[in-house]
């Protein structure tokens, strides 16, 4: 049986700046916006994660679109939220395709000074019509405290089972460090005492729950420190360190797409009812363009 994503050997962590599914993560079968992304670099299968911020726009990491030589990946496929990566492909449905990629003009993909590790993938048709998540504004970010619930999500490798990917996205807790964040921050380092991303979580969303209960994307996963066997490890401070690319500084790249006016659906043609008379016989005719039968006159 053909399946959406095949099991393959993940190579992301051979790339120095690559992030990683999770150690100590919890599987989420009903998440409405996390997306699994498979593609190829130089013919080699790769896996990343991302988040749907509109019916046709996915935010992910730039290194999930361009390799270290600046070459674009090929054969992109995108999982549908709430669907397992192992669900059979419906041959009667043509899946959305990558239409365009938006990245920062100052993106650096190679060397030691890699930067602006965020990309917005525009699809040629909706991947889903509901359930997507919005990006946190500067006001939202300024309202976060060390007590704010923050979680990372991804389809990457599962530390506990040694699986190279998770069939559904996994959720893991992260601590918010308001000291490391400023209104001009584009990259920040967050920590967790209990969990870390692993290979394949690159581009997965970091999500905060605001005081009003709404979930918003803070940014995307760009990297983890002390990576061994595909997962980050604790530093001397007993914390896992995770590098995040903040999303809001880059929203101008894709606002023109997000703000496009969606044409209203063509209204259904309205049926009209007329009354037709022939002597004492009365008939009511309902149609888009009703006409009285021969011998009848319209009342």
Which residues does each predicted region cover?
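Positively charged n-region of N-terminal signal peptides that target proteins for export
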Residues: 1-4
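Bacterial N-terminal signal peptides
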Residues: 7-14
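Sec-dependent signal peptide cleavage junction
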Residues: 15-23
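Polybasic, low-complexity, intrinsically disordered segments
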Residues: 20-21, 263-299
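Conserved catalytic-core segment of clan PA serine endopeptidases
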Residues: 22-33, 40-43, 66, 72-128
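C-terminal subregion of chymotrypsin/trypsin-like serine protease catalytic domains
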Residues: 47, 52-62, 75, 168-178, ...
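Acidic glycine-/aspartate-rich tracts in secreted/extracellular proteins
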Residues: 63-66, 82-85, 124-129, 155-159, ...
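Chymotrypsin/trypsin-fold serine protease catalytic domain
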Residues: 114-194, 226, 247, 251
């Amino acid at each position: 049986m053909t399946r959406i994503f095949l099991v393959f050997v993940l190579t992301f962590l051979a790339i120095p700046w690559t992030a990683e599914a999770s150690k100590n993560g919890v599987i989420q079968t009903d998440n409405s916006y996390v997306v699994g992304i498979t593609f190829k670099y130089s013919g080699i299968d790769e896996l990343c994660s991302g988040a749907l911020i509109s019916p046709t726009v996915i935010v992910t990491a730039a290194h999930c679109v361009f390799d270290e030589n600046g070459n674009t990946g090929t054969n992109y496929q995108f999982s549908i939220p709430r669907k397992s990566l192992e669900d059979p492909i419906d041959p009667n449905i043509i899946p959305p395709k990558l239409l365009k990629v938006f990245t920062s003009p100052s993106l650096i993909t190679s060397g030691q000074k890699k930067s602006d590790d965020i990309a917005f993938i525009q699809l040629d048709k909706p991947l889903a019509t509901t359930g997507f998540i919005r990006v946190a504004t500067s006001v939202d970010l300024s309202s976060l405290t060390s007590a704010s619930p923050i979680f990372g999500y991804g389809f990457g490798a599962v530390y506990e089972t040694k699986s190279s990917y998770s069939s559904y996205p996994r959720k893991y807790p992260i601590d918010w460090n308001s000291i490391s964040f400023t209104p001009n921050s584009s990259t920040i380092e967050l920590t967790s005492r209990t969990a870390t991303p692993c290979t394949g979580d690159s581009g997965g969303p970091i999500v905060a729950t605001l005081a009003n209960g709404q979930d918003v994307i803070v940014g995307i996963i760009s990297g983890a420190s002390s990576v061994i066997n595909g997962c980050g490890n604790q530093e001397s401070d007993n914390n896992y360190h995770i590098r995040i690319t903040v999303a809001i500084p880059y929203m101008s790249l894709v606002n023109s797409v997000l703000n496009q006016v969606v044409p209203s659906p063509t209204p259904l043609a309205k049926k009209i009812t007329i009354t037709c008379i022939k002597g004492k016989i009365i008939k009511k005719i309902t149609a888009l363009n009703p006409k009285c039968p021969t011998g009848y006159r319209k009342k």
